[in-house]
A protein has these predicted regions:
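Conserved N-proximal alpha/beta basic substrate-recognition cap immediately N-terminal to
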Residues: 44-57, 65-167
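Phosphate-binding site of ATP-dependent enzymes
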Residues: 173, 202-256, 305, 309-324, ...
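ATP-dependent carboxylate/phosphate-activation module, predominantly the ATP-grasp catalytic core
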Residues: 235-290, 325-326, 330, 345-368
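Short, positively charged and aromatic/hydrophobic N-terminal segments
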Residues: 3, 7-16
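Flexible, glycine/charged-enriched surface loops at secondary-structure junctions
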Residues: 296-306, 368-375
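N-terminal-proximal low-complexity accessory segments that begin disordered
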Residues: 18-56
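Peripheral (often C-terminal) accessory segments that flank ATP-dependent C-N-forming ligase machineries
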Residues: 323-329, 334, 363-402
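Glycine-rich phosphate-binding loop of ATP-grasp-fold ATP-dependent ligases
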Residues: 156, 175-205, 232, 254-272
Length: 402
């Protein structure tokens, strides 16, 4: 008995349809750099459970790739019944069958990597619709922490010898050592000079460094800052231009993403004012555009983000920019600094999702939402499945998001 393929509601308009894909294992796939890569179970389950979320930013008539159509429809209805009529959910077997007779306009994944290209080739996506291997290699290069260290960061060194790693840790006292490519806190190690004096677990760490250098070519080493607040700026490359899309106020637990504030851009700027001025944020934003636009204009189209940090600024924190007051003066009254680039995410981010979700809720909700009510967007795991949830409330000083 053959597979039954229902007629798609938008089949007559496939020439203008886009295929949307949520592939959150992207960062791990970049590290592996293989045509066929199998993500860990947690990554595969996250992709399956939240496969519906491109519906939040998709355009009318777009296809969204999912494992289970009924499951996706049930999940997305919690964010508005209109989403089920806006997009068409489609499984891999259905897509493979469809591509025998129809053409898509374009493909828009969470992030582009060699593994995803191989997956789409096997489904029958024409080569002309996919990035070349040369372009993917360049995207991978710009996605690396080595590239960020060279182009957007201060006080971050790319190191290819374990002895130099030890020198920098002794210089900084406390440091963060990172693999060039990793995901959700994996490939990130915190170490202090005290570990050398007490022996501690340093031999294990040294083996980890040697392994990263062997497999990925090197590691980055940077000072460990005393974090006050995580935040990010979200952008999109469109027609060769880097466009600012908004602030992302997010939180992490054990270096893994846990949630985002859902509110207007004006409210987010207001929340940040006790920590950093709007003018200084604008200056940082412009510097990022000036660096990223020429780097990406010929190789990448789509969303990207830059993670940042507000920290306490001590005398030794020479690489942390002083936070300026509202008049743009460095009076050193706050004792705060800003690290304007912790990571570059050359893909869609949960910050983009939060911006899109807020816009959708405002456009399709009651007057209460439109009067600047703040909510929190969370990704939660209940022991069985991952869930995207909206919870009422706003961050506080004691608990920014949790």
């Amino acid at each position: 008995m053959g597979i039954f393929f229902p007629i798609l509601r938008f089949s007559l308009y496939l020439c203008t349809m886009k295929l949307r894909i949520f592939n959150p294992e992207h960062d791990l796939a970049l590290a592996a750099n293989l045509k066929q890569f199998t993500a860990p179970h947690a990554g595969r389950q996250l992709r399956s459970d939240l496969a519906f979320i491109p519906a939040l930013w998709a355009e009318e008539g777009d296809l969204v790739l999912v494992d289970d159509i009924d499951f996706a429809k049930n999940r997305v209805r919690h964010f508005g019944a209109e989403l089920n009529s806006k997009v068409e959910f489609i499984t891999k077997p259905q897509l493979k069958h469809l591509l025998k007779t129809e053409f898509l306009d374009s493909v828009h994944p969470w992030g582009w990597n060699l593994s995803l290209k191989g997956e789409l080739e096997r489904l029958g996506i024409p080569e002309i619709m996919l990035p070349t291997d040369a372009v993917l290699n360049k995207v991978r290069e710009v996605s690396s922490r080595q590239w960020a260290a060279l182009h957007l960061q201060r006080g971050v060194e790319y190191v290819t010898e374990t002895a130099r790693v030890k020198e920098l840790i002794l210089q900084y006292g406390k440091a963060v050592v990172k693999a060039p490519w990793s995901s959700s806190g994996r490939g990130v190690k915190y170490v202090s000079a005290e570990d050398f004096r007490t022996a501690g677990d340093y031999p294990t760490f040294e083996r980890w460094v040697a392994n990263m250098i062997y497999h990925q070519g090197g590691v980055t080493v940077e000072p460990l800052y005393n974090k006050v607040r995580d935040f990010a700026m979200e952008f999109e490359m469109k027609d060769g231009k880097a466009l600012y899309r908004g602030l992302s106020l997010f939180d992490t637990i054990k270096n893994a993403y846990s949630g985002n504030v859902l509110c207007s851009e004006a409210e987010k700027v207001e929340m940040m004012k006790p920590l950093i001025s709007e003018a200084q944020l604008a200056g940082i934003r412009q510097r990022i555009i000036e660096v990223m636009e020429p780097a990406l204009k010929d190789i990448y189209s789509g969303p990207f983000g830059v993670d940042m940090m507000i920290c306490t600024k001590g005398e030794k924190d020479e690489f942390c920019e002083a936070v300026l007051n509202q008049e743009g003066e460095d009076v050193n009254r706050t004792g705060l600094g800003v690290v304007p680039c912790i990571e570059i995410n050359l893909r869609r981010t949960m910050g983009h999702v939060a911006i899109n979700l807020y816009e959708h809720l405002v456009a399709n909700s009651s007057d209460e939402m439109k009067t600047n009510r703040t909510n929190i967007m969370r990704v939660e795991y209940d022991g069985n499945r991952y869930h995207l949830r909206i919870k009422p409330g706003r961050p506080s000083e004691e608990a920014p998001l949790h």
